[in-house]
Structure formats: C-alpha cells, structure tokens
Amino acid sequence: MTIKDARTPASTQNTAQADTAENTDTAEDTEAGKSIGWHKAYVEGSRPDLRVPVRQVHLTNGQSVTLYDTSGPYTDPLVDTDVRRGLAPLRENWIIARGDTEEYAGRPVRPEDDGIKHTSPRGGLRNLDAVFPGRPRQPRRGRDGNAVTQLAYARRGEITPEMEYVAVRENVSPEVVREEIAAGRAVLPANINHPEIEPMIIGKRFLVKVNANIGNSAVTSSIEEEVDKMTWATRWGADTVMDLSTGRNIHTTREWVLRNSPVPIGTVPLYQALEKVDGRAEELTWEIYKDTVIEQAEQGVDYMTVHAGVRLPYVPLTANRKTGIVSRGGSIMAAWCLAHHKESFLYENFEELCEILAAYDVTYSLGDGLRPGSIADANDEAQFAELRTLGELNRIAKRCSVQTMIEGPGHVPMHKIKENIDLQQEICDEAPFYTLGPLTTDVAPAYDHITSGIGAAMIAWWGTAMLCYVTPKEHLGLPNRDDVKTGVITYKIAAHAADLAKGHPGAQEWDDALSDARFEFRWEDQFNLALDPDTAREFHDETLPAEPAKTAHFCSMCGPKFCSMKISQSITEQFGGTAAAGATAEEVAAGMLQKSKEFAESGNRVYLPLAD
C-alpha cells in the first residue's frame, strides 16, 4: 500500500466537490482557522476507490509522522465542503455492488418525528432551512429479509471493502478484522443508509475509540449548533458521535448531522419515542418504539442504544441506592414497567428488533440503564443483574447476525474498576465494552472530565474498546463547543495511554517522535505533534511570544541555565552516545565547564538556528 498526498489529485469520491480547491503545501485547518504543520494524505488499498485518510505531520528534521485521522473531508484542501450539500457517499458503490439490498419508498416524515403536533410551526432553525436540501435519496434495506451486516459477511468468510478500510487504519491484516467481527469481539458500525462514513472498528484488539455526545434539549441549542459540534468533535479526534437530542426538531437535526458526518452516528431511539407521547413514559408502546427505530434506521443511524436489560424484577434492586436510577433511558423504562407492572416491551420484543436492525446493519449498543450514578452504588446487584441480561441479549443478537457492543458504567472507584471489565468480558462473551468514564470520585463538578478520564484510561487498558467522553459540564449543563473539545482531548489522552499500555502497533511511534522533538528543542514539531497543537502553541507563547523563542534551547519553566534537557544534550555531545553512560563525575564536570566556556566564547547566544 502506498500513501498519496492530498496535494495531488483528490480521491475519486471527492473530485465532485473539489471545484474550487487549490493545491497547497500545507493543509489549511478550516475548523481551527490556522495553517498548521500537517496535511491530509491517503493510503491506497487494493482497489482504486479504497483510499484511507491519514494525517501526516511534517517535521523540521525532514521526517514525517503518520497519524490516524477522524476529521473527514473537512481538513482536505481539495474538498469544497458545504453542510447544505452533505458529504460524498464514499461507500455507496460498495453497498450496491454486493447486490443484497434494495431501495424502497420508506416511511413518510411526520410532524411528530420532530416533536411537532399536527400543523404547529417549526422553530429554532436559525440560519438553516428546516429540511435538509442535499441530494434526494431513498432508503435501502436488505433484500428478501437478508441480514446485510458486517457480522453476516464476516461469518461467511468475506472481507468487505469496509473491513479492508479499517485494517489499513489500524495497521493490521484484513483477516484479523474479519476474525474479530465474526467472533463478536469487534463491531464495524456502518448502516447501509449512511454511505458517507469513513469505516472504523471498535474492539479490544484495535485502537481504543472515543465517542462524543451532542444533541439539543428542550432548553437550548439549534440544528446549526449541533452540526457544528459534530464537525468540531471529529476535528479533535472523536471516532463516533451520539446525537442525544431531546428537544424539538429531533428528526431534522439528525438528518443534517448524518448527511455531514464522516464518523458513525449513534442514538437512543427511546428519547425520540418519548417525545412522540409528550414525555409520558406510561404511554409508550412497542409500536411507537418500533416505528421510531425504523425511522432512524432509514435515515442512516449506525448504532442504537437499547435499554432492553432494564427488567421489571430489577427495579426494586435500586430502591436502597444513594442515587437511584440515573440513566435517562433506564428511568424511562423503569417508569413504564412500574406503570403497567409488566415486563419491558424492549425485552419481550428483542428478537423482532434484531430482525429490523439486521436489515439495515444497525449495531446494538446494549444500554446500561441501571448503571451506578455515584461511587457508593458501584458494582451493586442491580448493575450486575442487568449485565447478566445484556449477556443473554448479546447471544440472541449474534444469532440474528446483528453486531453488538455492551455499555458500561458510570461512577466506579478505582479499586472496583477491574471487576467491571472482567465480568463484562466473561458474561458477554468478549463483546466490545463501551463505557462512560467511569468517574472515579463524585467530589469534582466542573472537573468530571478529569475524574472520569482517570477511570477511562484504566478500564481501556484492561480491555474496554470505546470510551464515551465526559465534558466539564457533566452534571451541570449542556456542553458548548469549547466543552466538546475539552472532553474529546481528555478522552483521546486516556485512549492513547491505554493503546500504549496494550502495545498497539505504532502507538509509541507518536510519543517517540514528540520526545525527540522535545529533547532537540524543535518547538514547532512539538506543537504540531501534540493532540492539541493550538493550545500547546498558545501556552508556550504566553511567556515567550517572540519568534526567536521557537529556536531557543529552553522554555519559561526553567530558563536557559536550568534546562535539564539542554544539560543532558551537552553531556551527550561531549561524550557521545553510550560512552556517556560510563562517564565519571569528574569527566561530566569537565564537560560542563568546557560547554560553559563555549557558551561564553560564542557571545552568550541563547538562540540558535535550526539545523538544515
């Protein structure tokens, strides 16, 4: 496989959008609004339409570092993106070529899909038209009741273009990808009605993934803001995005997000179903829920959180909890079960739901509706009773060829985290675990991205496949654009730390490149290799804003006389490589004295030019 530069002709799927693009030496980061030291490139697979995007960071020493990229076409200078048009359908030809799907008319969009009763006007669509104006499309589904899932293909021994795509992204063989999906240890969320996505995989043998939540509420936000949050989250590394909208215009918001998203989109159908009955949980029915799932599957939702593990017998187990049931979906289903004193309609109709999801390749994210909402409630009987049911449902889903991952807590102190992953892997046959944190303490509102980032790094090291981010606004309010970035960066740190601990191929190459740049005082390389180049550069320039500071052999932390790396570098230059390890104290002192003289003889020059 070869890497091709985005500064050469763009990929075939993007050429239609490249009308006004210009060739440039460095990609313009349109989201951050700054020109930075990397560009979009593509790794070619076995076929001309399989080109996997990567981020190539150019170093001042002439080398480059290739990094995983989730930002989609928005950072390709050859692609003219427009949210009103949406992204090009990257996977469309792959889906059609398989010959096992068909287009059909689909269900009509109804006013209640957007939380609107009959003819009441739509509101809150600032600066964007109500209906997505992009290319007309009809939904697809499996022909003749076929399961058109990546799991079904993998079990038949087929390596799909999507599987090869993620193999390139993960630096593994396509057969490894197929094996992990076939065994149910990994999922490749890719609804056939979301052809715009760049395929990715979730499983413990692969890079740890990060999900970012967006979504409006009855109190705040608009469609425009949610689309912006989605593109902003993927710019900083979100591997998937969940639209958790609970206010007006739920259907319309989701359509705009899906048509513009290069990453898989997840939802909780129960939220929209509840809006259709004016928020009265007791009025929910299987028919309303089923219709909502079909509506979302036709739009292209890639994975759905389904709280089918919240059963009537488990509700009393939460009575003595400190914080009760904190999951929105869990509380809705618990209220329904108690109102009717019946078993959950999600649990009782689970196999029929599997048939629907298999027809569109929607992945299950089996929800943890009884997760602990405080560390006092961690690892209690209610939580683990639900987990045992999720294991049962996972086996049913796999029998129906539906890809499945399992959601996990929540609030768990550090000494109880490992029990969660060990039990989940045992009970759920190693299905991918997808956890919210967990938060390791409850005392830090406004800093829960940190309390949860600690738990996230630990549980990912032990095998969690995807982490749901937590922002500083957790428990306090709806996150804004800055909160989204902070949450994503925090969780990318946790995920990468886990990748290092697991020994994922290529993970340490990134760290080594930044360490070399730090030791050699290549400041621009340090900035450009950082997870957040903008903030790294900003912090450096707060105290050393002058351009010559970018070549200084110190920073404002220690100054020119006390920089440990400069001193270490001087020792290495004096004695060279391995010889320095055997230097005596007298030799080190002599070397330091010699360097002091050289510094004085050079006119006490602090700033040195970069090497050619």
From Swiss-Prot:
Required cofactor(s): [4Fe-4S] cluster
Protein name, as recorded: Phosphomethylpyrimidine synthase
Family annotation (PANTHER family): PHOSPHOMETHYLPYRIMIDINE SYNTHASE, CHLOROPLASTIC, THIAMINE BIOSYNTHESIS PROTEIN THIC
Classification of source organism: Bacteria, Bacillati, Actinomycetota, Actinomycetes, Kitasatosporales
InterPro entries documented for this protein: ThiC (IPR037509), ThiC-associated_dom (IPR025747), ThiC/Bza_core_dom (IPR038521), ThiC/BzaA/B (IPR002817)
One GO biological process term: thiamine biosynthetic process
Catalytic activity annotation: 5-amino-1-(5-phospho-beta-D-ribosyl)imidazole + S-adenosyl-L-methionine = 4-amino-2-methyl-5-(phosphooxymethyl)pyrimidine + CO + 5'-deoxyadenosine + formate + L-methionine + 3 H(+)
Stretches with biased composition (Basic and acidic residues): 105-117
GO molecular function (one): 4 iron, 4 sulfur cluster binding
Binding site for substrate: N213, M242, Y271, H307, S327, R328, G329, D368, G369, L370, R371, E407, Y434
Record EC number: 4.1.99.17
Role summary: Catalyzes the synthesis of the hydroxymethylpyrimidine phosphate (HMP-P) moiety of thiamine from aminoimidazole ribotide (AIR) in a radical S-adenosyl-L-methionine (SAM)-dependent reaction.
Positions that bind [4Fe-4S] cluster: C555, C558, C563
Regions of compositional bias (Low complexity) in chain numbering: 12-24
Pathway: Cofactor biosynthesis; thiamine diphosphate biosynthesis
UniProt: Zn(2+) binding residues: H411, H475
Positions of the UniProt region annotated as Disordered: 1-33, 105-146
Keyword terms, alphabetized: 4Fe-4S, Iron, Iron-sulfur, Lyase, Metal-binding, S-adenosyl-L-methionine, Thiamine biosynthesis, Zinc
GO cellular component term of the entry, any: cytosol
Signal peptide positions on this chain: none
NCBIfam families: PRK09284.1, PRK13352.1, thiC
Family to which this protein belongs: Belongs to the ThiC family.
Cofactor note: Binds 1 [4Fe-4S] cluster per subunit. The cluster is coordinated with 3 cysteines and an exchangeable S-adenosyl-L-methionine.
Superkingdom of the source species: Bacteria
